[in-house]
C-alpha cells in the first residue's frame, strides 16, 4: 500500500502494545467491521509477522471458519491448533537465519498440520539467507498478496441425501 499497491478491500492492521494476542478481541473487531462496513465474508484474510504470526495462527486455529486464508511469517503456534489450521489455506514463511524466532517454530506447525491432514492446503517457504528482520520485505512483494487474493471461501453445502 505504501509503495502504491492497490489493495482490493479493507485493510485493518491492529497493533499489540504488550502482552499476547487475544483471538476473541480480534473476532470482535472482525464482527464489528462486518456489521458496519461492506465486508465480503468469502474474502477475510489474516497475516502477521513475528508476534503477529503467532497471533495469526492463534486466531486461525481458534476461528478457522471466520477466515478465508492466512499467512504467518517468522512465527509459530500451538500444535493443538493444527487440525483447525488444516481447514484453511495457510502459507508459512520463515527465514533460515532467524535467531529471534527459530525456523523450527514454523516447521513444527507445518509438520503438525500435515500430520493431522496430509492433504491440507498449507505451504511452508524457507527464505534462504534471511534473518528475522529481513523477511519483512515479503510485505512489499506481490507474491503474498496475489496468493491471498486468489483464495475465495467456498460455501459449505448441506447434503440432505445423507440423512
PLM ranges: what are they?
Residues 1-27:
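Active-site machinery of serine-nucleophile hydrolases
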Residues 6-9, 85-90:
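Short, proline-enriched alpha-helix->beta-strand connector loops that line the catalytic pocket
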Residues 16, 71-79:
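Active-site nucleophile loop of the alpha/beta-hydrolase fold
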Residues 19-50, 62-64:
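Gly/Ser-rich "nucleophile elbow"/oxyanion-hole loop immediately N-terminal to the catalytic nucleophile
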Residues 40-43, 68-69, 120-121:
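Short acidic capping loops at alpha-helix termini that bridge into adjacent secondary structure
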Residues 46-48, 73, 93:
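Short beta-strand immediately N-terminal to the catalytic nucleophile in serine-hydrolase-like folds
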Residues 53-64, 70:
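Short glycine-enriched nucleophile-adjacent loop
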Residues 89, 93, 97-163:
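C-terminal catalytic histidine-bearing segment of alpha/beta-hydrolase fold enzymes
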Amino acid at each position: 500500500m505504501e509503495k502504491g499497491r492497490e489493495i482490493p478491500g479493507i485493510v485493518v492492521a491492529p497493533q499489540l502494545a504488550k502482552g499476547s494476542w487475544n483471538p476473541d478481541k480480534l473476532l470482535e473487531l472482525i464482527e464489528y467491521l462486518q456489521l458496519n462496513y461492506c465486508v465480503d465474508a468469502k474474502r477475510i484474510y489474516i497475516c502477521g509477522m513475528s508476534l503477529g504470526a503467532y497471533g495469526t495462527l492463534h486466531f486461525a486455529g481458534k476461528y478457522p471458519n471466520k477466515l478465508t486464508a492466512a499467512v504467518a511469517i517468522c512465527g509459530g503456534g500451538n500444535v493443538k491448533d493444527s487440525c483447525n489450521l488444516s481447514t484453511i489455506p495457510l502459507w508459512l514463511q520463515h527465514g533460515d537465519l532467524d535467531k529471534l524466532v527459530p525456523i523450527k517454530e514454523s516447521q513444527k506447525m507445518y509438520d503438525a498440520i500435515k500430520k493431522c491432514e496430509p492433504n491440507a492446503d498449507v505451504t511452508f517457504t524457507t527464505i534462504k539467507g534471511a534473518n528475522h528482520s529481513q523477511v519483512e520485505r515479503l510485505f512489499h512483494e506481490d507474491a503474498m498478496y496475489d496468493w491471498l487474493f486468489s483464495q475465495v471461501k467456498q460455501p459449505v453445502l448441506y447434503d440432505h441425501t445423507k440423512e
